[in-house]
């Protein structure tokens, strides 16, 4: 099973927007692209929204059937580990192996020494085709990389081989994720992480490193654009080298997590993947849930009241909602409007404050990030929330489709 060159993860917290998401992708594909939709949902999201992996499979299959989509599509068991993978085995065909929590864990001395010995041919000045400067590789560097990443790649191997036994070799896509950590992986670290994965028999088709800068949820990239550009291109060159040198799948590509709304770096990624003829996987989820709230606000009446209630409850539960996402949000509490202020907002004011239009006078990234992590508030409302999604499906669907196509795919693929 092979992933298409270009793919987009389209998470959907409440499984009501699959058709609208797919419409956006089909619209982009009319330009000659072949973007594969990947419906992704994590175990944490399933727990918060009281759903099951089978619900995601049904949503994907139903959307594809309703719209007559003929391309490849996938269902991603997002951010799984050995303790959570089993419930996804039957319905997923794409597995994101999250091994970030194993970074820095101790490996046996003998394993580290064996890895260092296997890298002898790369010692000294290592030239990566296309890279401006050679990489300096020595035993100290390799020991540090092994100490940091060997346990994580071993964990990836254990999850992969469990899945291989359960599903059969070649019957699923493997992604390895190391993004939910504080410190970015450098291109030279990525190179030897890829060697470890190859040595351990993990045929990763996508890898999600932690990039330089901040990838906060639902808002634009924050960081040194010049540094990101350099590292992103070097990562792409490292992947090319790893395919030829280590025998990894030739279609391996970078996966960008928390990838929605990073408008300032989309042109950079587009330029680099075009220059080197490489693929890309962009993972999104919360941006669609935010469009549901925007759509409800635009509907007015009970929809607007629901949106205001969700914000009020989110503000009250702010600490517990933000805690699981501490590494990927930055909210200035002094910039959050009061519940009383929001009560007086019109549909347009609420939608414009939440919608990600950089430069719009009403746009508030703090408000947006809080709503982003507040989907549990809506989940706890149960049918009260989902009934309104169905009642206002047309306006919400239009918001979702516009967001994925106009603000994401058009920017990312220069449409």
Residue ranges and their predicted role:
Residues 178-180:
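Short, well-ordered beta-to-alpha junction loops that form the rim of enzyme active sites
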Residues 170-174:
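Short, conserved phosphate-binding/catalytic loop or strand-edge motifs used
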Residues 74, 175, 253:
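Hydrophobic "anchor" residues on beta-strands that sit immediately upstream
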Residues 61-62, 176:
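A generic local structural motif
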Residues 1-59, 65-67, 83-103, 108, ...:
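Active-site capping/gating regions of soluble enzymes
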Residues 78, 176, 257:
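Conserved, mostly hydrophobic/aromatic
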Residues 111-126, 130, 134-147, 216-231, ...:
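Glycine-rich tight-turn/loop motif centered on a GG-T
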């Amino acid at each position: 099973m092979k992933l298409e060159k270009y793919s987009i993860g389209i998470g959907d917290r409440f499984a009501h927007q699959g058709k609208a998401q797919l419409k956006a992708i089909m619209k982009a594909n009319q330009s000659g692209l072949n973007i594969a939709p990947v419906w992704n949902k994590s175990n944490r999201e399933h727990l918060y929204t009281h759903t099951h992996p089978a619900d995601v499979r049904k949503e994907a299959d139903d959307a594809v059937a309703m719209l007559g989509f003929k391309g490849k599509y996938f269902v991603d068991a997002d951010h799984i580990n050995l303790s959570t993978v089993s419930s996804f085995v039957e319905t997923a065909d794409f597995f994101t192996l999250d091994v970030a929590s194993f970074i820095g864990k101790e490996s046996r001395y003998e394993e580290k020494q064996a890895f260092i010995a296997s890298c002898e041919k790369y010692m000294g000045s290592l030239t990566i085709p296309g890279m401006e400067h050679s990489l300096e590789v020595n035993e100290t560097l390799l020991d540090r990389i092994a100490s940091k990443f060997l346990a994580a790649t071993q964990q990836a191997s254990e999850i992969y081989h469990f899945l291989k036994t359960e599903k059969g070799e070649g019957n699923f896509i493997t992604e390895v994720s190391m993004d939910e950590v504080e410190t970015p992986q450098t291109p030279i670290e990525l190179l030897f992480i890829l060697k470890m994965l190859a040595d351990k028999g993990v045929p990763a088709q996508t890898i999600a490193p932690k990039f330089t800068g901040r990838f906060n949820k639902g808002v634009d990239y924050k960081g040194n654009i010049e540094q990101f550009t350099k590292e992103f291109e070097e990562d792409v060159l490292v992947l090319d080298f790893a395919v030829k040198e280590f025998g990894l799948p030739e279609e391996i590509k970078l996966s960008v997590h928390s990838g929605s709304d990073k408008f300032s770096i989309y042109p950079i990624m587009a330029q680099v993947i075009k220059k080197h003829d490489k693929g890309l996987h962009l993972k999104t989820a919360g941006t669609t849930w935010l469009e549901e709230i925007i759509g409800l606000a635009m509907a007015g009446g009970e929809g607007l009241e629901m949106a205001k209630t969700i914000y009020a409850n989110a503000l009250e539960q702010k600490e517990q909602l933000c805690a699981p996402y501490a590494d990927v949000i930055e909210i200035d509490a002094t910039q959050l409007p009061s519940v009383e202020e929001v009560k007086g907002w019109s549909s347009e004011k609420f939608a414009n404050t939440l919608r990600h239009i950089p430069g719009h006078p009403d746009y508030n990234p703090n408000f947006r990030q809080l709503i982003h992590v507040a989907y549990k508030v809506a989940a706890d409302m149960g049918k009260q929330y989902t009934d309104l999604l169905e009642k206002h499906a047309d306006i919400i669907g239009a918001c979702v489709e516009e967001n994925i196509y106009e603000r994401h795919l058009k920017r990312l693929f220069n449409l």
